[in-house]
């Protein structure tokens, strides 16, 4: 099984559910102001994000659904180049060995592959045209930082998100796409207003498509002396029948792909 996401996206607050979520909550006006600030930043980010190349290192794991005892399939390193508002992958190594494709023995129990995390979720949440429903969800800490947490939901009718099941051994080829709605959580640094983490869970998908949760962590990364807000890690966990799959990835060795526009992530 292989899994990809392709995308192209207002702002709507709904009341938070439950007493716990309302405790110590900022005023509705403060929540709306925070979301407006983040939306404005994200829309500029998507319009002006420079082209980059980095290394994505993914630990592929699998487990029987009955026991949930995880074991490693492989550790794969990919060159990820981001340009023309799209991701381009090249497999570098599997378990440290130079290869052009994932060995069949590593894929014997199935194989989960994901693209789209570099800019996908921010585009879905914040680009004009879709109106996610936000609700206050509480406070949490992300890597020691106090984060404002909002739940969100995008309906199938409004969503442009797509997921694909791909048949061939080559990544992201021979794929059948399906449109879906989704929901998740948005974590915002209470001081800097940086986006720290976004999670998403698909809705409305047939059983043969990936059913699970994906989380992307963002951090400030210096590239050529400039600072950018970029993905630093992600996790996806899903299942296919009686088998669970999990990918834990890190993004390192960022460098400029080409000279383009510059987006600094100074706090508003």
Predicted regions and their residues:
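Bacterial N-terminal signal peptides
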Residues: 6-17
């Amino acid at each position: 099984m292989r899994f990809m996401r392709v995308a192209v996206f207002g702002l709507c607050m709904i009341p938070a559910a439950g007493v716990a979520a309302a405790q110590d909550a900022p005023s509705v006006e403060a929540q709306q102001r925070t979301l407006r600030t983040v939306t404005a930043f994200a829309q500029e980010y998507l319009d002006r994000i420079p082209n980059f190349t980095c290394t994505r290192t993914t630990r592929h794991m699998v487990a029987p659904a009955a026991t949930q005892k995880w074991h490693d399939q492989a550790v794969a390193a990919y060159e990820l180049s981001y340009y023309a508002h799209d991701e381009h992958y090249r497999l570098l190594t599997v378990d440290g060995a130079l290869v052009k494709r994932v060995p069949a023995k590593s894929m014997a129990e199935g194989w989960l592959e994901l693209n789209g995390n570099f800019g996908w979720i921010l585009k879905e949440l914040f680009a004009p045209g879709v109106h996610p429903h936000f609700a206050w969800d509480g406070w949490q800490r992300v890597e020691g930082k106090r984060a404002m947490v909002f739940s969100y939901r995008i309906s199938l009718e409004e969503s442009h998100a797509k997921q694909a099941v791909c048949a061939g051994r080559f990544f992201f080829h021979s794929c059948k796409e399906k449109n879906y709605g989704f929901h998740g959580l948005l974590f915002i640094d209470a001081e800097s207003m940086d986006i720290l983490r976004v999670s998403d869970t698909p809705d409305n998908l047939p059983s043969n498509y990936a059913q699970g949760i994906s989380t992307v962590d963002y951090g400030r990364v210096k590239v050529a002396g400039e600072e950018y807000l970029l993905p630093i890690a992600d996790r996806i966990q899903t299942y296919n029948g009686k088998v669970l799959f999990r990918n834990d990835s890190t993004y390192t060795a960022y460098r400029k792909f080409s000279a383009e526009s510059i987006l600094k992530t100074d706090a508003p």
